A protein has these predicted regions:
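Walker A (P-loop) phosphate-binding motif
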Residues: 2-32
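C-terminal lobe/tail of nucleotide-utilizing enzymes
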Residues: 2, 220-306
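Ferredoxin-like iron-sulfur electron-transfer modules
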Residues: 27, 31-34, 55-78, 89-108
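Flexible beta-alpha connector loops of hexameric P-loop NTPases
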Residues: 145-154, 208
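Short beta-strand-centered segment that lines the nucleotide-binding/catalytic pocket of NTP-utilizing
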Residues: 36-51, 125-130
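Iron-sulfur cluster-binding cysteine motifs and their immediate structural context
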Residues: 81-101, 111-126
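Hydrophobic alpha-helical segments and helix pairs
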Residues: 105-143
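Conserved catalytic-core segment of NTP-binding enzymes
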Residues: 118, 125-130, 155, 159-258
Length: 306
């Protein structure tokens, strides 16, 4: 079942623990159930766990290299040009001395390597993380993981996007739909994935903190000029659903659907079997199952899928 080109849906949210991965995995599964070719990309590189909800394993591990300048002391003229032009101040230069690299500040931009008049900088690299690719239950997964102690998470996300673009260049019609599962927050990792998406689905919850963080992610989405609709997860929490939905309506925030508390969702999460996978035998009349089905139908209409 093919569409003209793959639609890219970004599942995101302003805070951790709202159910982004839960929604991303189950939405991917529902498209898979209907014969669509689906790619799920886990862009929460500091805590990738989509594969856990699918009871799968990380496979096909590939290192992600990151540029680091190596200064050749025998060639360096001690001019200080590299330090003067380093935007992240990663090269410490004291008059008539060899610049000292502070690797934790280096952005990997390679400017120092390109402008050195003495060719005294060699390109060196360190591993900042890994990518994985696997197939689980006819679902394609691309996963990024940041190496512990490393801070350049955006470098892993950029590598995921690069891998995606290379795949689409080779096989433009390989996938019908691509789903991003982002990190929580409204930082550069999230911005990179939202910018590559056709539509965005922020996940929130009916609490004051949920509302506050939803506002932050919507501000970023609007800045990037993307269309979005919200999913309210745990909508029956604290009996605040009606008031919360009314507040969203007052602010002209469109809602794709809401998901109430349901023990089947908890069970599926714990055993690593998605609620909406037709082979897992969960109750089709359960509150969570019905809610996800409603969200899926609304999403297909939004995407103009037949």
């Amino acid at each position: 079942m093919k569409t003209k080109k793959p639609k890219i849906v970004c599942i995101t949210g302003g805070k951790g623990g709202t159910g982004k991965t839960l929604c991303a995995v189950n939405i991917a599964i529902m498209f898979k159930n209907e014969g669509y070719n689906v790619l799920l990309i886990d862009g929460d590189v500091e805590n990738p766990n989509t594969y856990l909800l699918l009871n799968g394993k990380l496979e096909n591990k590939i290192e992600v290299p990151f540029f680091m300048p190596q200064i050749l002391e025998d060639r360096c003229s001690k001019c200080g040009l590299c330090s003067q032009n380093c935007a992240s101040h990663a090269l410490l230069y004291i008059d008539d001395s060899i610049p000292i690299l502070m690797s934790s500040l280096c952005s990997g931009c390679k400017l120092c390597y390109k402008i050195c008049p003495e060719n005294a900088i060699n390109p060196d690299f360190k591993t900042i993380g890994w990518t994985y690719s696997t197939e689980i239950s006819d679902l394609s997964l691309l996963i990024g993981e940041l190496k512990p102690s490393e801070a350049r998470s955006a470098g892993i996300v950029e590598k995921l996007i690069e891998n995606l673009e290379n795949d689409l260049q080779k096989e433009p019609n390989k996938f019908d739909i691509i789903i991003f599962d982002t990190a929580p927050g409204a930082h550069c990792d999230v911005e990179l994935l939202i910018d590559k998406s056709d539509i965005v689905i922020p996940i929130t919850e009916p609490t004051r903190f949920g509302k506050l963080d939803l506002g932050r992610i919507i501000e970023l989405i609007n800045l990037l000029k993307k269309d979005y609709k919200v999913i309210v997860n745990r909508s029956s929490l604290l009996g605040y659903k009606d008031q919360f939905l009314a507040e969203l309506q007052e602010e002209n925030i469109k809602v794709l659907g809401d998901i109430p508390m349901d023990s089947d969702i908890v069970d599926s999460y714990c055993i690593g079997k998605p609620l909406m996978d037709k082979e897992n035998g969960f109750n089709n009349n359960g509150a969570g199952f019905i809610a996800f089905t409603h969200i899926y139908e609304n999403l297909k209409k939004w995407l103009e899928f037949n």
